[in-house]
Amino acid sequence: MLLLNNRRRIIGLIIGLLLLCTIFIFSIVLGYADTSFKTAIKAFQQFNGSNEHIIIKEVRLPRALIGTIVGSSLAITGALLQALTKNPLASPDLLGINSGASFFVIIGLFFFSINSLQAFAWLAFLGAAAAGLIVYFLGSLGNEGLTPIKLTLAGAAMAAMFSSFAHGFLVMNESALEEVLFWMAGSVQGRSLEILFSVLPYMIMGTLLAFLISNKMNVYSMGEDVARGLGQRTGTVKLLIGISVILLSGSAVAVAGPIGFIGIVVPHIVKWLVGNDYRWILPFCGITGGILLLLADIGARLILMPQEVPVGIMTAIIGTPFFIYIARNGGKSS
């Protein structure tokens, strides 16, 4: 833990916000089309309809906004899930959320010939929410109620089921593969602000709920027996965490598709910086998640110019070594 007191943590938040703003600006400027900081400033002050100005305002600005907000949502979701399940490798994949979203998109494409990104977004949100609710219900069965191990097992089972069904439908209809493959890889390219704004209220509600229960999560993280001994209603806390997870991850998947590793990597980096106080973990996760996804998106544009790599592949390249490191060290991030 590097930031040992609240004063240092506040300074760390300010530095993180400044770094996020800096990378956000670079995200608007960098890409296949050659633009400069001066051109970017003129695009906002004196828009003239040129190709450079259109690219900056209509393509890169929405892309940077979406990358920031989606990265933030995924990182906060990862922190919530790791607290809920006591699993240091937990992420939205754990609850079958990504698989559920992909399955609903493929169903819409296969049976109803839906192929627009706007429709994909709502199908993905419904699929993510349905998967999360089913897993939560299955994990709550039995006399003990919801337990981390039952939730993990239910999530793994549902993820496997949704993935199997989705791949089965794609094999039966290979023409649908090309239309959905880029979305399934996870990307912020070509996503409109209209899609983001349609789910933004759910993201805001999920984030506010997470911040409101952050102190209760500190008590819950001591162990359920200790939390109950201190008078906490652990069932209510787990339910609220689950609602926040579904709102945040469902919205993020709806906008950008299934993007992995942000939810695993960022909480460990943040815990190494600020310790185990969720009142600080969650805001730091929000900032760091936005930074990491923006960096991954910039790399996705530049690594194979003029071609673009889906940002989900870039996050996998960044996250896989870190994932292996965490697994080898038994999930200890600090």
What residue spans do the PLM features occupy?
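Alpha-helical transmembrane segments in inner-membrane proteins
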Residues: M1-S334
